[in-house]
């Protein structure tokens, strides 16, 4: 299912309340700790051997912030998310050889971080809107693999 007008309204009304560094660090940390095989893409980040090391790693925080900031920019291009991510998709597929399932995994980790941030405001309706967005982003980033 694509992004509806209501999804877009919900996303636009809540995204600006986030701190990209905090949410990004938590989401990427969750990805790296929950799916430890994803750490192979981040060997330059240093010690990722414990939860404490992952969740307090400055490189994880910086890259998480970069990813979440990119999603914020993609929100401004919801009519052409595939076009917005075309170059990044190509880079992830041809240069980094990232498993495209990791984009969906990151979306799941980001959903958990958003739920922790928004608490009661993270209704099933808001969750669904973000899931639609993250699915569209994962699809766009996976486009370079086709």
From Swiss-Prot:
Residues 2-146 form the Globin domain. InterPro entries: Globin (IPR000971), Globin-like_sf (IPR009050), Globin/Proto (IPR012292), Hemoglobin_b (IPR002337), Hemoglobin_oxygen_transport (IPR050056). GO terms for molecular function: haptoglobin binding; heme binding; metal ion binding; organic acid binding; oxygen binding; oxygen carrier activity; peroxidase activity. Keywords: Heme, Iron, Metal-binding, Oxygen transport, Transport. One of its GO terms (biological process) is hydrogen peroxide catabolic process. CDD domains: Hb-beta-like. Involved in oxygen transport from the lung to the various peripheral tissues. This is Hemoglobin subunit beta-1. It comes from Xenopus laevis.
